[in-house]
Amino acid sequence: MASLFDINAAAAVKDYSIKPRLSYNTVNSITGPLVILDNIRRPQYNEIVNLNLPDGSVRSGQVLEVAGHKAIVQVFEGTSGVDVRKTTIDFTGHSMRIPVSEDMLGRVFNGSGLPIDKGPNLLAEDYLDINGSPINPYARIYPEEMIQTGISSIDGLNSIARGQKIPIFSAAGLPHNEIAAQICRQAGLVKRPTKDVHDGHEDNFSIVFAAMGVNLETARFFQRDFEENGSFERVTLFLNLANDPTIERIITPRLALSASEFLAYQTEKHVLTILTDMTSYADALREVSAAREEVPGRRGYPGYMYTDLSTIYERAGRVEGRNGSITQIPILTMPNDDITHPIPDLTGYITEGQIFVDRQLHNNAIYPPINVLPSLSRLMKSAIGEGMTRNDHGDVSNQLYAMYAIGRDAASMKSVVGEEALSQEDRLALEFLGKFEKTFISQGAYENRTIFETLDLAWSLLRIFPREMLTRIPKKILDQYYSRSSAYTESSKDVIDNTPESS
């Protein structure tokens, strides 16, 4: 007869809850990543189950569907090696939870939330449901104040507010991984005079990074980049590799967002959550849907993909009574560069803008190849201006957009009629176009520009045009910044100014 000590030890190892668990040996069939169970008493939707294999290994799964005494379970580690007759199933009685702690910063976890950095086990401060807690819409606060990425084309023209969700639309072969790593290295709060010392302190900012379906080389790139540049101590990294079970990709972003919610709402940090690649997530969703033999929607994706994506994207934001915020930047690769594909199409409906990575700019050796014309930040107005960035930010952004669009039109006209037929204004626009792409959009992978350096650089480019052509900037702002003597030009000393100096 087993001793009381042995019984207690076994209970601790198996993590028994207060309610006794029920074990079953009633596996009916296996279909892809799904296990169909019969004769189950009171199964619960989203309940976590443990599968005990004949070789002694244990795999975890989640109840996807309940019909009477039947249950469909998706196995996170895959169903390879699962024996229909000899596998036993333990029902835990609760949904999937992740242990969270401030010690998660500087750690690396796999797609199931287990540490893979050879560090000690996490001493949990709390256990959170990975599906998150519903937020009362009335308690949400409108996103305000800017998160600085150090990239001029984002900070200057598509500013990101704390609590915003804005995706990066990329494609195969484009440097979205390098852009994501650069944002992680450089992102922070705007340094500005404030009475709230705690809110503006760099220790009050952290990053949660989740990679789904990446290859080993990409995973090593992210880890090495964070470690070498000293930003790793403020980053929590979740890695789901390409050779990991596809089904694991469905829970990886939810684990990352649960960690973000703990850091934002319990430790009151400003958290930037980066999710890459959401295309891999959607493909995993399609695989599960096909295994369940559901009626497919557009291009084989499930009809509920819009709802499913919203359960991820809508977890960004700010909550009344908490100083923290969750800002979300999901990255997705558009199949065949098609922005009408269901994944970017549905993502654009849910999120608050987009940042567009352009193949033509990439082919012209411009990094980061962000095309600002199709890019948009819908909450930019609330993140910029006097007291948050600078009083000229909004007007400068509008003028840059206008002149860049005119320059693109002039370039198209030049290819048809030749440069000799262009007007003086068109030639100035062409000059601006070249310098804007080579000096403003283009910057080094390790070049971190503050928002003030970005605005100064923008003014040095706008001085290519006579003052009367800058029709989108009020006279008061022009008086303050147009003349060289009243502008800060440290960041723009390498830009040639072809206009005479204003008096």
From Swiss-Prot:
One of its GO terms (molecular function) is ATP hydrolysis activity. InterPro entries: ATP-synt_VA_C, ATPase_a/bsu_AS, ATPase_F1/V1/A1_a/bsu_N, ATPase_F1/V1/A1_a/bsu_nucl-bd, ATPase_V1-cplx_bsu, P-loop_NTPase, V-ATPase_su_B/beta. It is found in: Vacuole membrane. CDD domains: ATP-synt_V_A-type_beta_C (cd18112), ATP-synt_V_A-type_beta_N (cd18118), V_A-ATPase_B (cd01135). Its main location: membrane. ATP binds at R378. Gene3D superfamilies: 3.40.50.12240. It comes from the Eukaryota. Pfam families: ATP-synt_ab (PF00006), ATP-synt_ab_N (PF02874), ATP-synt_VA_C (PF22919). It is a peripheral membrane protein. Keywords: ATP-binding, Hydrogen ion transport, Ion transport, Membrane, Nucleotide-binding, Phosphoprotein, Transport, Vacuole. The modification Phosphoserine is found at S491, S492, S502, S503. GO terms for biological process: ATP metabolic process; vacuolar acidification. GO terms for cellular component: cytoplasm; vacuolar proton-transporting V-type ATPase, V1 domain. Non-catalytic subunit of the V1 complex of vacuolar(H+)-ATPase (V-ATPase), a multisubunit enzyme composed of a peripheral complex (V1) that hydrolyzes ATP and a membrane integral complex (V0) that translocates protons. V-ATPase is responsible for acidifying and maintaining the pH of intracellular compartments. V-ATPase is a heteromultimeric enzyme composed of a peripheral catalytic V1 complex (components A to H) attached to an integral membrane V0 proton pore complex (components: a, c, c', c'', d, e, f and VOA1). Interacts with rav1. Belongs to the ATPase alpha/beta chains family. This is V-type proton ATPase subunit B.
